[in-house]
Amino acid sequence: MDFDTITSISTPMGEGAIGIVRLSGPQAIEIGDILYKGKKKLSEVETHTINYGHIIDPETNETVEEVMVSVLRAPKTFTREDIIEINCHGGILTINRILELTMTYGARMAEPGEYTKRAFLNGRIDLSQAEAVMDFIRSKTDRASKVAMNQIEGRLSDLIKKQRQSILEILAQVEVNIDYPEYDDVEDATTDFLLEQSKRIKEEINQLLETGAQGKIMREGLSTVIVGRPNVGKSSMLNNLIQDNKAIVTEVAGTTRDVLEEYVNVRGVPLRLVDTAGIRDTEDIVEKIGVERSRKALSEADLILFVLNNNEPLTEDDQTLFEVIKNEDVIVIINKTDLEQRLDVSELREMIGDMPLIQTSMLKQEGIDELEIQIKDLFFGGEVQNQDMTYVSNSRHISLLKQARQSIQDAIDAAESGIPMDMVQIDLTRTWEILGEIIGESASDELIDQLFSQFCLGK
């Protein structure tokens, strides 16, 4: 596949130790030769080397920057094209000038994700691996990055390819049956083989889908909302869980006016932790906006930490808030146990039923371990699975696997009902195509463009 040469800045904009301008395509090294001056031309150096020299403006012969240039020749590169990477000092002015020079002499500004898209289109990686690159970049915990790396290395791709190959073998057997319908023994053998292999594939799909809940949490974090009346200790809880003073803590009710969000690793479980403004009726315009945002965060939560004040009886506001969240996954927390107990625990237990109940003192940092263990128990049965497992963490993959499972079940049902093999063949072919969408073998151009548009510029 022929492409033009693209260029972009591959490091974050702003001041820094280094900045990198990356070029990929058939003219990458040629453009480098025009701009670079060193002991040798870039076209003359060995591949996969780093070369010291200077970037020169060809029009003025002015030295623009002192650089180190990496030269990587196709096909042993990320895009399977010639690549050069110009490493210069960090700083907006210089790196932009180098970028402009590369475009002046023949390169085009890359679109978001275009390098990874070329890696996919040139057969370097498949679509699921390409998506995992973005998951890796966005990962917030070691476990999430490991899960993404496993997918980049092709763990999921290998499983999907094996399943598709098995379906092709079934289809080949079905073709024999269709071509020689007069042989009953061939039909019986085909049906037995089809059912055995199809049920095995369905079970493998089931096993992948069983990792979906954990995988999605690994990828996106468990959306955990801390909720309660003002001044019950929500911000103190956020600070204790992330072990940092990100939220302002005072004795003044309504201090938190907005939704605060942090990522934290709790015993191997990545939490997307959200501290909300206390939910109450208020005339304060700013606080009222915060309360509305809190309600929105509640509607999107995987887990709710409902915080109550040990030093106060249950209030009507507590009961009203509980009515909003009672059908969700909730851990109830009695905070401020270092103060005199005025909360009737038996009354609370009657209200919350068998929901998990933890007692804490955020001031004295008591009960935090019990809370972390309860979170882990609630979502992972007390044990987070091995990060080396093959997880399905992408919503698109989960949806396609569910479709594939239904399609192959349709094939099984049809075969067991004695429906003609040419009809069963339709369901099997559909399953093969759906699985192909996961790795990009049968994905539409529109889907591919949409997926890569979510990448950052320069990747």
UniProtKB/Swiss-Prot annotation:
Amino-acid positions noted as binding Mg(2+) in the UniProt annotation, renumbered to this chain: S235, T256
Keywords (A to Z) from UniProt: Cytoplasm, GTP-binding, Hydrolase, Magnesium, Metal-binding, Nucleotide-binding, Potassium, tRNA processing
Domain TrmE-type G, first and last residues per copy: 221-380
A single GO BP: tRNA wobble uridine modification
Main location: cytoplasm
Pfam family name, one: MMR_HSR1
Residues that coordinate or bind GTP: 231-236, 250-256, 275-278
Superkingdom per UniProt: Bacteria
Cofactor note: Binds 1 potassium ion per subunit.
Binding site for K(+): N231, T250, V252, T255
GO molecular function, one term: metal ion binding
Hydrolase listed as a keyword: yes
Secreted recorded as keyword: no
E.C. number: 3.6.-.-
Requisite cofactors: K(+)
Compartment list: Cytoplasm
Positions annotated to bind (6S)-5-formyl-5,6,7,8-tetrahydrofolate: R22, E85, R124, K459
InterPro entries hit by this protein: G_TrmE, GTP-bd, GTP-bd_TrmE_N, GTPase_MnmE, MnmE_dom2, MnmE_helical, P-loop_NTPase, Small_GTP-bd
Reported function: Exhibits a very high intrinsic GTPase hydrolysis rate. Involved in the addition of a carboxymethylaminomethyl (cmnm) group at the wobble position (U34) of certain tRNAs, forming tRNA-cmnm(5)s(2)U34.
Family note: Belongs to the TRAFAC class TrmE-Era-EngA-EngB-Septin-like GTPase superfamily. TrmE GTPase family.
Name under which the protein is recorded: tRNA modification GTPase MnmE
Organism field: Staphylococcus epidermidis (strain ATCC 35984 / DSM 28319 / BCRC 17069 / CCUG 31568 / BM 3577 / RP62A)
Gene that encodes it: mnmE
